[in-house]
């Protein structure tokens, strides 16, 4: 009888341990790929150097404003054409990591083991992003000088209301007399921002462009190339940087990563890891 009870006990213990093991496997979060971005996210979230770089970028842009206003031949847009000297003035900014700081979303992705686009829409709908350091004073300065502020973003149109709410909640300039928030998927617009910049250029002289990706300044076609060619693009437009174009540092994501994979993201983590390692130059 004692042996039988011991047998039942052993069986019950085995079932319990198996169940515990299965549950553990189910709830274990695979963060292996997300953790590769951890240092870049921590840099953006906790380093003084990142904050200083953002403030430096926007302070530099503010110092150029009066010169840009005075020079009627001044334009920052490659899409600008014809006689624009008498047009009203505008500045175009990207939104994410340029105006709105989404580093908390990136932190969530690491902790949850999920990767973009999982959770992105939900984050956007919260409308709780904080401003990128330096942007508030820059935009206040520009707005006070009579410059129209346009936000050109590749957030999907579903997030338009929440994005507007977020920007207004931060007290940033946001005019309601015309559409100043130009979303992807709105009016048939795709990811390339050329057509949206051209739309603004019809009525405004564009003084500056501000963003964190090459495509905030040039066409998607020109920017979607290999690593070496992208580096040459920085040199090609060397007379624009820090004068008419202002780039924010974003080590967390962007087309720069796509260039590592030949602009075609691999299907497996193993292949992605290999391509990342192959891109390193010791």
PLM regions: where:
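C-terminal cap/substrate-recognition subdomain and adjoining C-terminal extension
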Residues: 28-31, 59, 160-282
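Active-site neighborhood of HAD-like aspartate-dependent phosphohydrolases
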Residues: 88, 99-130, 144
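Surface-exposed patches in mature extracellular/periplasmic domains of secreted proteins
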Residues: 69-81, 149-154, 176-179
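Substrate-recognition element of Asp-dependent hydrolases with the DxDx(T/V) motif
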Residues: 97, 135-168, 214
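Second-shell loop/turn segments in exported
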Residues: 43-52, 121-128, 150-156, 186
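Non-catalytic pre-domain segments flanking phosphatase-related domains
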Residues: 24-93, 260-282
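Bacterial Sec-dependent N-terminal signal peptides
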Residues: 1-28
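Structural recognition of the beta-strand scaffold that forms the well-ordered cores
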Residues: 90-94, 100-102, 148-153, 180-182, ...
